[in-house]
A protein has these predicted regions:
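C-terminal accessory/regulatory regions appended to core domains
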Residues: 1-92
Length: 92
């Protein structure tokens, strides 16, 4: 399960304004017209996907419930995903 909050670089309790600001910053950073990196297009799509989900209150609520349930049902896999996301952020 993707951590869309990590994709945008915000906390789970981020306001709508913080989400929008993070989305604009990341979209600008990874837009294929502005970033020649081979993985920029993929990161741009992930950023769009994360914002589309988190900007819709119903989808965001469902996502938060799935995150909570995932942590309770499979803590090792969730911890590994969190650690992987953290390490990827460090090397960027």
């Amino acid at each position: 399960m993707k951590d869309y909050y990590a994709v945008l670089g915000v906390e789970a309790d981020a306001s709508d304004g913080a989400l929008k600001s993070a989305y604009r910053r990341r979209a600008s950073e990874f837009h294929p017209d502005r970033n020649p990196s081979p993985d920029a297009a993929q990161k741009f799509r992930e950023t769009q996907e994360a914002y589309d989900l988190l900007s819709d209150p119903a989808k965001r609520h469902d996502h938060d419930e799935n995150r909570r349930r995932s942590l309770l049902e499979n803590p090792l896999a969730t911890a590994q995903d969190i650690w992987k996301t953290y390490m990827n952020k460090l090397v960027q």
